[in-house]
Regions:
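A glycine- and small-residue-enriched flexible loop/hinge signal that marks low-structured segments
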Residues: 2-22, 32-47, 53, 66-67, ...
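Cofactor-binding catalytic cores of oxidoreductases
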Residues: 57
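Soluble or luminal CAZymes and related metallo-dependent hydrolases
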Residues: 72
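Hydrophobic alpha-helical segments
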Residues: 384-391, 420-424
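C-terminal edge-of-domain segments
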Residues: 403-435
Length: 435
């Protein structure tokens, strides 16, 4: 066996032997990032305080009762059902948790105290039943109900053996006493204040999401969400979209203003987040549960488009999206009407977000900034744009449209590119010659 061996940086080894390096053949590493994530502050009767919880569509359908205190089909879950019509994932924040009170109850004379896991009025729907166990006369069945649904049963001999469940915590010592049912009481919701919304935005800024939504009518809070969106997009480079109701004053490509009912922002947020970069929401059928006010005249719909309003119209028995637009209306030569199209913005945002992610994951601090390194990065970008070309999100692309140059400092890389996003057909102008 040779004395020398291993890998090498330069051929300067002393001992005879084989020194072998294995390297990957150069290939693109990046791909399009995930869409479909909605950040949602919501007033709820149950749930953790001051915390962002992540729920996917499957969890929502199967575990809504355990997580949110209501079953999937309950009326209180309608906003989330609307969001999940399009979203894959929701970053949920209970906006009225702070300042609430937990429901409590005491069972028997030995001091079994039950406290709801979370503050809120839903805790008042919890009931505890203690009954004799039919198989062991020394033990009891302690049953937790929420509404009429049995959610937990524990068979124990003493209070100390009881474990917390998804809805209540048990405290006390000694023997249990049989009771047909003791309801918890005193649960109260907190209030949703401007401070609560600021706290939510502070926390959600650290999360990855596609679309932010606020369903309220408070103008100060709308302005807060508008400013947050503009700061993230323009100062931080995080290309999110925010959906509000009746807020065309934003005049910004990152803010969508819904014209019809305020509660439709939930559906719009889910659809906007879940739409692929090669999809438009124009003429999409509304498949949600709310009654939609579409009683507008033709000229009002025309004005809505000019104002930058996202509107719904009646098409026979269906309700559909009039035009997939945002609030940007202050067109200029360097920023024209294309920027008012949400499909175009989805493409541009995807390019910006994915380019930043690819550079950070695979090139930042890892690849030398010389001609070879910059050529690798260019090839990466070319491959990425070809993915967009293949799904018809962009058109007329060739590799000469991307130029990668050294910057002023040795660490700087400059990229100049030309891109042509596509959009969906919306207007048909047809001339027919009749002979």
């Amino acid at each position: 066996m040779a004395l020398g061996g291993g890998t090498f940086t330069v051929p300067n080894k002393v001992l005879p032997g084989a020194y072998i390096n294995f390297v990957s053949m150069a290939r693109a590493l990046g791909s399009m990032g995930e869409r479909g994530i909605v950040a949602l502050p919501l007033e709820m009767n149950w749930g953790p305080e001051d915390e962002v919880i992540t729920i996917d569509a499957g969890e929502f359908q199967k575990e809504a009762l355990n997580i949110l205190g209501y079953s999937f089909a309950d009326e209180e879950m309608k906003p989330l059902r609307e969001v999940f019509k399009g979203a894959k994932l929701v970053k949920l924040y209970r906006i009225n948790g702070a300042g609430g009170k937990k429901a409590t109850a005491t069972v028997g004379t030995e001091g079994l105290t039950i406290t709801a896991k979370h503050p809120g009025t839903r805790g008042n729907d919890i009931k505890i039943v203690v009954q004799a166990n039919i198989d062991d006369e020394t033990k009891f069945d302690v049953i937790t109900y929420i509404g009429t649904t049995k959610v937990d049963t524990q068979t124990v001999a003493t209070i100390a053996e009881l474990e917390p469940n998804n809805f209540v915590e048990f405290n006390g010592t000694g023997a249990l006493e049989i009771t047909a049912g003791v309801p918890l009481a005193g649960g109260e919701n907190g209030t949703s204040t401007g401070e609560n919304y600021s706290s939510f935005l502070d926390k959600i800024e650290a999360e990855d999401f596609t679309t932010l939504v606020y369903a309220g009518e408070d103008e100060v809070t709308k302005a807060l969400f508008d400013s947050f969106t503009k700061r993230l997009r323009d100062d931080e480079g995080v290309k999110i979209t925010t959906v509000l109701h009746d807020y065309v004053k934003a005049d910004f490509e990152g803010v969508i203003s819904v014209k019809n009912n305020p509660e439709l922002v939930y559906w719009v947020a889910g659809q906007s987040a879940g739409a692929n970069v090669n999809e438009s929401l124009t003429n999409r059928k509304y498949d949600g549960e709310y009654e939609v006010n579409t009683k507008f005249k033709k000229r009002e719909f025309e004005q809505a488009i000019q104002n930058g309003e996202f509107a719904f119209y009646q098409d026979g028995n269906d309700v559909r999206v009039l035009k997939d637009i945002n609030t940007f209306t202050n067109f200029a030569p360097e920023k024209n009407q294309d920027f008012s199209s949400n499909r175009v913005i989805r493409v541009l945002d995807q390019i910006a977000n994915d380019t930043a992610r690819i550079f950070s994951d695979y090139y930042l601090g890892k690849v030398t900034n010389d001609d070879t390194g910059r050529e690798l990065f260019k090839n990466e970008l070319v491959n990425y744009h070809e993915q967009l070309l293949n799904i018809r999100a962009i058109e007329n692309f060739n590799q000469e449209d991307i130029i990668v140059l050294p910057g002023v400092q040795k660490q700087d890389v400059i990229v100049n590119e030309v891109v042509q996003p596509t959009d969906s057909m919306e207007k048909l102008y047809m001339s027919i010659e009749v002979r």
